[in-house]
Amino acid sequence: MASKVYFADLRADYHENLQQKLTRLMKTAGMGNIDFQDKYVAIKLHFGEPGNLAFLRPNWAKTVADFVKERGGKPFLTDCNTLYVGGRKNALDHMDSAMLNGFGPMTTGCQIIIADGLKGNDEVEVPVVGGEYVKNAKIGRAVMDADVFISLTHFKGHEEAGFGGCLKNIGMGCGSRAGKMEQHNAGKPHVKQKLCIGCGQCWKICAHGAPIIADGKAVIDHDRCVGCGRCIAVCPKNAVQINWDETTTNLNRKIAEYTKAVVDGRPCFHISLVIDVSPNCDCRPENDMPIVPNVGMFASFDPVALDMACVDAVNAQTPLRGSAADGGEGHAHDHFRRIHPDTDWRSCLEHGEKLGIGTREYELIKI
């Protein structure tokens, strides 16, 4: 049975601006039917890496937060720390980056909570029912503490997943640093010797005695290592690193399984804005020009159908001249495969459907 995906274009006038139109979209799509009264509501979004300007403006987040508050809910904006070195690898830097990009209580009407804590190791292990690659997903604690979960996604391309949509925002985004490692990595971490200062933090955090300090440097015993990634979170010099070696198909399937861990068993709703569709992730410290014109706003209770509708909407557009999707050979009707030919984005939606998260069949309802 097809799921309903609601769509609003980006036309606006004196009687209704785009924030008001988003509110109407949420109402029409049924978000108001969720019982928000006295509930803690996680609004999951990406605050943007410093230097990137393609992330969603704080005004969009405020519109969603206000909708929740008007119905008695207690919203907060949230994301988890990144696995790689950058402006969001710990909660302090992450908060600074969010504020630098305009996110704060005054601009969004609610507080920001970095879900996996100061060092990215405040996590909950959540069973993945039917998981083939992940049995227990490592999810940021604040995400799982919320009574209601709302995803607010900037839909764009992604260099590893093919595109970054609702499932990517939830599955990868809600993983703790160890959870992100599990998705990206098919092996175990190693220590970059020239960065290691021999402080022993990795040894202290490891429950399996895998890190060994020898000659003032840490070395990881892979026979003891279980690949939990906690050593990555505590290393002050980012010397503990992973091999980014998971296949794109397996990565996408793991993203789907992590998404299932987040959304199972509680009210959820999903919003995706197909605007400023950059070819790469908002995790990058820059953003290339959009690959297609702005399309509009989409909303649904079904995250799989939502992603499918957004993909179809982007692929129906003519690529912008001079963009990464302009010209080239092959994949004429798949802009994401054109710009990232080695990716397999369909595997995420197919696996999500198999897991029962949603369906790729949808009915598009324009408001």
Feature names for model-found ranges:
Residues 2-60, 66-79, 84-367:
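Extended, low-polarity segments enriched in aliphatic/aromatic residues
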